[in-house]
Amino acid sequence: MRVIRKKLRGAVMASIVLAVVASCHWGDISFCASSSVPREWTRKDTVDFQLPVLMAGRTFHFVVDVRHTEAYTYRDLWVLLRHNVADSLHWQTDTLRCPLYSEDGYPLGKGLTGLYTVEIPYGTLVSDGSSQARVQLVHCIADSAVVGISDIGIRIRN
């Protein structure tokens, strides 16, 4: 009986270690951050991310992650994305369309129980390696306050 318990314990531990190692993407994600937004996200509520020092001259792929509830009443979320990754002295501003619902009104993305996560590719950038690199996000919907966005974040991949 003890031998079976030892073998079972060893198999369980090996399974846990294997699951942890398999869930990691070594070298895939260079930076990942998320920020909760207020219940009513206004244009004054800028979401600001200070990026770690990225290696100069490397190309990175940006992805914006939006987590929303069914309380969000529009099909798309429009976001102003400002960054100074390519050149820390100059800010670049882009408007990013984040589709959250299909034309039929069904939520896009993954999620359960009314909370959905949508990944929106932003593009690729070459870093200047500055320690001052930042990314800022603010909604640009016509309403002064947006309800139903629980958090928004960025991922930077090699």
Model feature map: region roles:
Residues 64-72:
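Short amphipathic, basic-aromatic surface patches that mediate peripheral association
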Residues 73-79, 148-150:
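Short coil-to-beta strand junction motifs in C2/discoidin
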